Design a protein with these regions (language model features):
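Long, hydrophobic, well-ordered secondary-structure blocks that form the structural core
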Residues: 1-12
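C-terminal catalytic domain of Rieske-type non-heme iron oxygenases
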Residues: 12-15, 19-245
Length: 245
């Protein structure tokens, strides 16, 4: 590509932890120490994100502000009501751990499988077996590692409107998981349907439950009847996200 013919400008970029970090300014400097902080850098380095393989991406359009979409990932006390027939069957509601790193954060959701895992020696505990880590990366990224791979959620404003947004959901899997799928396919098992089930399961919870409730909340905010909102002590992630913006 002849960059001079297309008006393209080279932006500063680095690849680290399997992520591509790009600065929006041509003379910008990317400093991950400043962006993430030493503790989060160390934590990311302990994972194996760089081996993840991209499998699928979906786009969800919503009638709400993009920040409300991010907020749907920020607490679990609503699980017993909004997700009573879905997530609440696999997760304990109103039970989470949160830590902040600069303008970022990490929420730990408590799976019901932790009840059995806690009976094992601590040396056999696995963070993804008993919980779901949910990383918030300022300003618009939600990243969730799973035993099989990871979900990456990117929220964007749409149509230059504070009342519209869209989400891009990317699904990643570790190579050994995809190899297992291929091996099962060779035996005649429709193993790829297992991947489709993951996509559809995530979509049904996010699109049909979380985003519906958040869009309804957006309409309520537009009424002008609320002068302020109060975040509770069981919503530390929402405190952090609000301060970061």
């Amino acid at each position: 590509i002849d960059k001079d013919c297309y008006g393209l400008k080279e932006l500063p970029a680095i690849e680290k932890f399997g992520f591509l970090w790009v600065h929006p300014c041509t003379d910008g400097v990317i400093n991950l120490d400043d962006l993430l902080g030493e503790k989060l850098l160390t934590e990311f380095d302990s994972w194996d994100f760089q081996s993840l393989v991209f499998a699928n991406e979906e786009k969800y359009e919503t009638e709400m502000n993009w920040k409300l979409a991010i907020d749907t990932f920020g607490e679990t006390y609503h699980f017993s009501v909004l997700h009573k027939d879905s997530l609440f069957e696999s997760f304990h509601g109103n039970c989470q751990l949160f830590d902040s790193f600069k303008r970022n954060g990490r929420l730990i959701l408590c799976k019901r499988t932790i009840d059995e895992m806690r009976k094992l020696p601590e040396s056999e505990w696995n963070i993804c077996a008993g919980s779901l880590p949910v990383y918030y990366l300022f300003p618009n990224i939600i990243f969730m590692p799973t035993p099989e791979g990871a979900f990456l959620v990117k929220e964007y404003p749409a149509e230059k409107s504070p009342h519209k947004s869209f989400s891009k959901i990317s699904f990643y899997f570790y190579p050994h998981v995809l190899e297992q799928i291929d091996q099962l396919e060779k035996t005649g098992v429709d193993a790829k349907q297992l991947l489709e089930d993951q996509y559809n399961g995530f979509s049904s919870v996010i699109q049909d439950e979380d985003y519906v409730a958040a869009a309804s909340s957006h309409k309520g905010l537009l009424s002008g009847n609320l002068d302020f909102l109060t975040f509770g002590k069981n919503e530390p992630a929402l405190h952090q996200i609000g301060r970061a913006h």
